[in-house]
Structures are given as structure tokens and as C-alpha cells.
Amino acid sequence: MKRQKLQETMIPPYETALQEAEKSAATMEKYLHHVRQFVAHDAGRRIDKALVLEYKTRLGNLYAPSSANAALAAVNGFLRFWGFESCCVRPFKVQKKLYCPEEKELSREEYIRLVRAAKEKSSERLALLLETICATGIRVSELPYITVEAAVRGEAVVHCKGKTRTVFLPAALQKKLRRYIQGQKIQSGSVFITRTGKPMNRSNIWREMKALCERANVAPSKVFPHSLRHLFARCFYSIDHDVAKLADILGHSNINTTRIYIITTGAEHRRKMETMRLVI
């Protein structure tokens, strides 16, 4: 195995490789964040398995297994790029969840309260944004693809993670979008934009959603853009129990990712067990 010390100069070429692999901006930001932390902590040290195992132990002491694994995936990719395949480490074992904690799962009723709270605050844009994510299941990073042209066609062509898929807009949503576009005098391009005309970013949306919690009487732990995507998945699956079709709609390459989205709450799990009536 070649000998080389960990250096900050190793990061830019890896960043270029991620760009050439057509990774999304959000994915690149996440990967580079973890790699920079790894390099900053151990710069100047020889790259070997012991170094990476030490890093893994540090992650295990600081983060939950799922968060630690995200960091390990980024650093393993960085090591492979530089030819240190033998230094890569295995992820932490994570037990498959049987149900979703109720304090993290947004219900349909809570979603409705959030939309109403946005309308009460005279935030038509935020209310429509919530409805758009929840009615289509798109990622928050894919919102820029909800354009004036998409609202006219009734479908959006989304490019994400090296794949292209068509997202259909329900007729009721299409009507609302067109009315909003007309009212805001948006001529073309993304519908959800800031005052300067730029597409809203993840942090703007997150902050505005969190501001609705108290008025809507919804726990902040449930209010994230991704919670709306999960709610879409559960509602769709309750109508059509086709997880493969749902994976295609959500843009998942791995069907196991989709299965995580449709896990029910502990209360629902308990209700199903009660209906079995196996205690004599």
C-alpha cells in the first residue's frame, strides 16, 4: 500500500470527481463537509487503516449510528478516490426499525393545520409550497423544477442524482399554482422564489416551516420538508400497495429506502397487534 499523509490539497480533486459524477449540490455539500472534518482533525498523519478506525470510533462516540454511517460513507468514497481502498471501514450495524417514533411522524391532520397556519399568516407562498411537496412527494431540493412551464403542462421533469423522472401535478394543485403564478406575475422559471427572484433554498424553507409550529400546534420535531415527502409516501401506499411503483415516483434507486418511508407508527403497530386477539 502506498504511503501518503492526509492533506487538505487532496480535497479539491475529490470535489471535482464528485462534480463529474453528477452528484447533486446537496450530496456534494454533505460529502465534503464530512471529508473536511476528517482531514482537519488528522491532517499530516499517515493514511492507514488504524487512522480510519480511530475516526470511526470517534464518530461512534459522538453520533447515532445512522449519522455516523453517513460520515463514513463520505470518507470511504474519498479514500477510494485516492486509491486507499484497503483503508475503508465497514459501517455501524443499524437494527431495522419496525415502526416510526410518533414524535417524528407528521400526520395528515397536522399537515392540514400547518397549511392553515401558513394561510392565517398570509403566507400564500409557504402554504402552496407545503401542498406542492406533500401532493407530489418531491424532494425539497427538487422544488426549482416546479416551474411556470410545469404548471401549464401539469407535470414537472425533474433531474436529480443523475436520473430524470416525470412528476405529475394533481389537477387541484395545478390550478392553485397557475392562480398563484398569475397573481405574482411570474413570467417563467421557478414558481417558489425569493424577493430577489432566486429559487428558495432549503434553509429558507426550513426556517419558515418551523415558524408555523406554535400556531399550528405541531411539535417542531415533526416539521421538516422531508416529513411532507414521507406523508405523501404513506398516503400513496395506503391506496396502492405497490412499493416498486412508489420507489419510481419518489426517485429511489433502492427499494429498501422506500420501505423506510412507509413504516407505520408504534401506535398503528400496537393497534394491529390488538386486533389479532391472540390472548385468550
Residue ranges and their predicted role:
Residues 1-280:
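Conserved catalytic core of the tyrosine transesterase superfamily
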